[in-house]
UniProtKB/Swiss-Prot annotation:
Species assigned in the record: Homo sapiens (Human)
Active-site residue numbers: 119
EC numbers on record: 5.6.2.4
Short sequence motif named DEVH box, residue ranges: 219-222
Domain of life of the native organism: Eukaryota
SUPFAM superfamilies for this protein: P-loop containing nucleoside triphosphate hydrolases
Composition skew (Polar residues), residue ranges: 595-608, 630-639
Protein name: ATP-dependent DNA helicase Q1
Annotated effect of mutating residue 564 to A: Nearly complete loss of DNA fork unwinding, retains ATPase activity (in a 49-616 residue fragment)
Cofactor(s) required, per the database record: Mg(2+); Mn(2+); Zn(2+)
Length: 649
């Protein structure tokens, strides 16, 4: 008869296996829900196509873009005249004319269009073709300031109201809202103005009764939905506008929204029937690239300066940073090396923001080093590069920010520097957001991918089907001619879990930095585990492996909140129990190599001309001299600083 200990051991094994099966069932259930959702989307699209092709369909309610791509409406002559003589444009971009015709017909419409596609024109031009004024709701004051600057240059009467508006200005705007002879065409407000100002709502009612309030434009309409990447609670109050002013047509605009987000936004805005026009996410002139972020700040700045002085010599660009502090520090570093750069962030004085924007627009400043506060509504067509000093907090944000390059349809580069530490800096910021961590991990997955077309990865996120061949080698992954293989990294995961278990027993919390140090046999001796052999891989490879385990849920983040900061720690994740099954394997794609090593493919570009390299080499000497002088000057201040690798530039 079997002993109790043997039976107990078998029972424990079965229990562990059952737990693993439960996790697998959960994963399959999640996948099932994804497929069901995609099936619904495709079914809806097929139904829409069939309805659009129905010969008996009424043109008044025909939601196909083709039905509205005409110039025989009563307002068409005026629209064309204003396009050419006020906005100084010869023709419309895709879906602009269709959207303008729908809103001119007094109907509700949502427009999903890539950043740089010309969404703003779709409510600005109709405002000039209509009596009265259009109310524009924007999420950021900086966005309103950007738009007003452009409108002023075009000679269009527009203004904004916010918390810092003077009493005299508020009084003037309120008077203009009901003045039948007023030339004021666009009034910009934040959603807080609608939610919290009874005085303003009262004035809107009087303007509506006087038939002066004709249209509502909700910019960044994805902010309505809690499932959107930038949910704002005050956007939920905007439903009052259609309830109180049903005859004022509404137009909602966004660069990034899934079908789920748009449906949610439609309910929140109290819209019964709504046209939805969606342009393809693809910007064929943009080249996407992910680079490993150098761990040394000086090396990092050197890499950026070589790009600016080489490939982008004399060309305009944006560098996006994670924080205001990063923005200012990078700006100073670039200026010290001869780059004409200006910082831009939310805490700048309005006049300073305007100065930076104006100088950049006039090419007096080559590079704006900015936080996310810069960009919405930016309409500089000749931006040749957008560099991300740190990755964005979501795919939607990255798509929107990188999309500010190449609005003139000429080739432009979108280069993202991916660093392990940025994961946890951003995670600590988005932890309180509804789906903040999930969206961040999608961004990490994009950065970690070394083989799949960048456009395919984006298309999957935005519910589109994309053939990688259509990329035309306009991303780093499509340019690679390396072979790839799946590397078994299961034992690495087992070792990390041993380290984390020991830390738990000692009542210790491990930050990502401490976990790597312990794994490498460094740091506090008590955190090292007997039997865990330090891997021989470079630190950046170990970081990629840990990031892989994190997004695959073998590890998870835990947070500690202090009065001054949110600290991220790593703990054992929900899928770690799968490792109780000896047959369970975790693999990771790596570049195939003849050497017995784990190496992720380094970033490379293939669309740049040989002249780029020559230009970089030509400017490299000047850069090295400047860098050497800087080091010489700072040497006495920081004798322990690491010597910059100038010879490797």
């Amino acid at each position: 008869m079997a002993s109790v200990s043997a039976l107990t051991e078998e029972l424990d094994s079965i229990t562990s296996e059952l737990h693993a099966v439960e996790i697998q069932i959960q994963e399959l259930t999640e996948r099932q829900q994804e497929l069901i959702q995609k099936k619904k989307v495709l079914t809806k699209k097929i139904k829409q196509c069939l309805e659009d092709s129905d010969a008996g369909a009424s043109n008044e309610y025909d939601s196909s873009p083709a039905a509205w791509n005409k110039e025989d409406f009563p307002w068409s002559g005026k629209v064309k005249d204003i396009l050419q003589n006020v906005f100084k444009l010869e023709k419309f971009r895709p879906l602009q004319l269709e959207t303008i015709n729908v809103t001119m017909a007094g109907k509700e419409v949502f427009l999903v269009m890539p950043t740089g596609g010309g969404k703003s024109l779709c409510y600005q031009l109709p405002a000039l073709c209509s009596d009265g004024f259009t109310l524009v709701i924007c999420p950021l004051i900086s966005l309103m300031e950007d738009q007003l600057m452009v409108l002023k240059q075009l000679g269009i009467s527009a203004t904004m109201l916010n918390a810092s508006s003077s009493k005299e200005h508020v009084k003037w705007v309120h008077a203009e809202m009901v003045n039948k002879n007023s030339e004021l065409k666009l009034i910009y407000v934040t959603p807080e103005k609608i939610a919290k100002s009874k005085m303003f709502m009262s004035r809107l009612e009087k303007a509506y009764e006087a038939r002066r309030f004709t249209r509502i434009a909700v910019d960044e309409v994805h902010c309505c939905s809690q499932w959107g990447h930038d949910f704002r609670p005050d956007y939920k109050a905007l439903g009052i506008l259609k309830r109180q002013f049903p005859n004022a047509s509404l137009i909602g605009l966004t660069a990034t929204a899934t079908n789920h987000v748009l449906t949610d936004a439609q309910k929140i805005l109290c819209i019964e029937k709504c046209f939805t026009f969606t342009a393809s996410f693809n910007r064929p002139n943009l080249y996407y690239e992910v680079r490993q972020k150098p761990s040394n700040t000086e090396d990092f700045i050197e890499d950026i300066v070589k790009l600016i002085n080489g490939r982008y010599k004399g060309q305009s660009g944006i560098i996006y940073c994670f924080s205001q502090k990063d923005s200012e520090q990078v700006t100073v570093s670039l200026q010290n090396l001869g780059i004409h750069a200006g910082a831009y962030h939310a805490n700048l004085e309005p006049e300073d923001k305007t100065t930076v924007h104006r100088k950049w627009s006039a090419n007096e400043i080559q590079v704006v080093v900015a936080t996310v506060a810069f960009g919405m509504g930016i309409d500089k067509p000749d931006v040749r590069f957008v560099i991300h000093h740190s990755m964005s907090k979501s795919m939607e944000n990255y798509y929107q920010e990188s999309g500010r390059a190449g609005r003139d349809d000429m080739k432009a580069d979108c280069i993202l520097y991916y660093g392990f530490g940025d994961i946890f800096r951003i995670s600590s910021m988005v932890v309180m957001e509804n789906v903040g961590q999930q969206k961040l991990y999608e961004m990490v997955s994009y950065c970690q991918n070394i083989s799949k077309c960048r456009r395919v990865l984006m298309a999957q996120h935005f519910d589109e089907v994309w053939n990688s061949e259509a990329c035309n080698k306009m991303c780093d992954n499509c340019c690679k001619d390396s072979a790839f293989e799946r590397k078994n990294i299961t034992e690495y995961c087992r070792d990390l879990i041993k380290i984390l278990k020991q830390a738990e027993e000692l009542n210790e919390k491990l930050t990502p930095l401490k976990l790597i140090d312990s794994w490498m046999g460094k740091g506090a001796a008590k955190l090292r585990v007997a039997g865990v052999v330090a891997p021989t891989l470079p630190r950046e490879d170990l970081e990629k492996i840990i990031a892989h385990f994190l997004i695959q849920q073998y590890l998870k983040e835990d947070y500690s909140f202090t009065a001054y900061a949110t600290i991220s720690y790593l703990k054992i994740g929900p899928k770690a129990n799968l490792l109780n099954n000896e047959a369970h394997a975790i693999t990771m794609q790596v570049t195939k190599s003849t050497q017995n090593s784990f190496r992720a493919e380094s970033s490379q570009t293939c669309h740049s001309e040989q002249g780029d390299k020559k230009m970089e080499e030509k400017n490299s000497g000047n850069f090295q001299k400047k860098a050497a002088n800087m080091l010489q000057q700072s040497g006495s201040k920081n004798t322990g600083a690491k010597k910059r690798k100038i010879d490797d530039a």
